[in-house]
Amino acid sequence: MSAIPAEESDQLLIRPLGAGQEVGRSCIILEFKGRKIMLDCGIHPGLEGMDALPYIDLIDPAEIDLLLISHFHLDHCGALPWFLQKTSFKGRTFMTHATKAIYRWLLSDYVKVSNISADDMLYTETDLEESMDKIETINFHEVKEVAGIKFWCYHAGHVLGAAMFMIEIAGVKLLYTGDFSRQEDRHLMAAEIPNIKPDILIIESTYGTHIHEKREEREARFCNTVHDIVNRGGRGLIPVFALGRAQELLLILDEYWQNHPELHDIPIYYASSLAKKCMAVYQTYVNAMNDKIRKQININNPFVFKHISNLKSMDHFDDIGPSVVMASPGMIQNGLSRELFESWCTDKRNGVIIAGYCVEGTLAKHIMSEPEEITTMSGQKLPLKMSVDYISFSAHTDYQQTSEFIRALKPPHVILVHGEQNEMARLKAALIREYEDNDEVHIEVHNPRNTEAVTLNFRGEKLAKVMGFLADKKPEQGQRVSGILVKRNFNYHILSPCDLSNYTDLAMSTVKQTQAIPYTGPFYLLYYQLQKLTGDVEELEIQEKPALKVFKSITVVQEPGMVVLEWLANPSNDMYADTVTTVILEVQSNPKIRKGAVQKVSKKLEMHVYSKRLEVMLQDIFGEDCVSVKDDSVLSVTVDGKTANINLETRAVECEEGSEDDESLREMVELAAQRLYEALTPVH
């Protein structure tokens, strides 16, 4: 049994190459109807070099039509420069404007602070720079189409520019949330709930069945913890990624310091090599934030802080007395946050606040279990005496937000990604429990491991739209409509051939047939024979040569020793041309037909020729407006209101009533008619 072509198959495959029962290196492959899409292309924060990549070796990058990046975090876009520059990928890549602006600086920082040899680096600063030219931008809610794949995006909350992508292939809709948050915070709007219900929902499961504490309570706990650390003369370290939650925490701290004058002498530093560039991006893209920020920008820019200074490196840091430092990266793997942590961890007055989600295998995750000692980057063992607090500002959905989002959309299939194995399993079980007694809503929940494919079947109806000329008139019941069926990507149209150039990129071609046939007989014999057969023969003159138009489509031109047929090739015209050819060959090859035909038509053809030429002659004498044909056997000449009629068969001329006394007109017409007849009559 022959395999079904991928484009005709009803099978849809979803395969995580990363973020399958793990957090990190998000990369989901979608295959349907011969199209392949990659959703995100991240790295694993807890791994290095090639080990941090998704399982790209399981696919052929050249087959990917479209790559969509949900947001700028490294676990969602960190492998993108490598994929665009080091593989055979030739498809198109899209992300939002804000994501592209921040991607450039965030990955530049990643390249600089990575603590691995140049040989193990996935890509260079040059690769990153060149990858920018291959990335296209999309506005929120803007519909685009690539290779028959329609897609658009919604606000996802989470971070500035984060997007959820709705993808439609052959009528099947899939929503990929990326990382999203349904809770509005100080600067970001909550994730939108699409008004279109998807058939498949690929959704993050980072927090599983956990419920977040209320925003107000969380902010108060955070501010109190920071206040306690500086009150005891300590230094507060808040490891964050340069962009994302950092801006939210800066807004909170700046407002808290403003309301507490006793803290004004204690400095807050935003320690990132990207600090200045990042804040410029945030100050630019305020229109992508929530209403509160957009209203405030009319008075002052909330991202121009009063109590926070930028700290580019440790060289510029005067580490004397209590202070608060927000430093990147967020999981304390390397960079400024790692330097400060190793410098401060032995003093019990100091404190570290973990404010975001931590991936397994990172130092941030390790210290949350409060070990007695830690290992420095140089391999030295240090006692951990500073306080460790975990206050999650991670803008991911909790169980309540996730379940409400699913309840609003009611997708038949839910695919869980971006969650640790146990958290994901608990979320899957909770969702199944929620809908097991609901007869109206049937939802299948899947939680595939990395490289494991989820296979779904979608059998869509094929509808063809009648367009253009064929759609001008409403068809009646039982009427047959015929045209050309045009398939473009996954859309079918029925068109008239004349509309092809209007509705498609197809060019219309015509084939002109020319056929020469030997013929030596009188040309008028062909006229007679074809007229007798078809009743549809028109006399023409082409380049001063006698010609006939038969069936309104076949042109017959007299040439010396032959006739030439011309027509536009199509099934009906070809059939007409065969008929005309048969008649010509029959007249040419059969002397009896020619002799009999001459006798039958000589008189008729003589009258025909005589009539035409007499009309021309009289027009030359009296003027074109004075001569008219009454019927096949009568010509009329009218001069100064007097009319003379000529009987072409008898050549008799009679004047109409009131014109009898004008003998001169009658005699003049009669003489002209007689002389022409004598000139045309052959001498035997």
UniProtKB/Swiss-Prot annotation:
EC number(s) given by UniProt: 3.1.27.-
This protein's record includes keyword Ubl conjugation: yes
Protein name from the UniProt record: Cleavage and polyadenylation specificity factor subunit 3
Top EC class for this record: hydrolase
Any GO CC annotation of this UniProt entry: mRNA cleavage and polyadenylation specificity factor complex
Lineage: Eukaryota, Metazoa, Chordata, Craniata, Vertebrata
One of the protein's GO biological processes: co-transcriptional mRNA 3'-end processing, cleavage and polyadenylation pathway
Subunit structure and binding partners: Component of the cleavage and polyadenylation specificity factor (CPSF) complex, composed of CPSF1, CPSF2, CPSF3, CPSF4 and FIP1L1. Interacts with CPSF2, CSTF2 and SYMPK. Interacts with TUT1; the interaction is direct and mediates the recruitment of the CPSF complex on the 3'UTR of pre-mRNAs. Interacts with WDR33. Interacts with ZC3H3. Interacts with ISY1; this interaction is in an RNA independent manner. Interacts with the microprocessor complex subunits DGCR8 and DROSHA; this interaction is in an RNA dependent manner.
Phosphoserine, modified sites: 659
Catalytic site positions: 396 (proton donor)
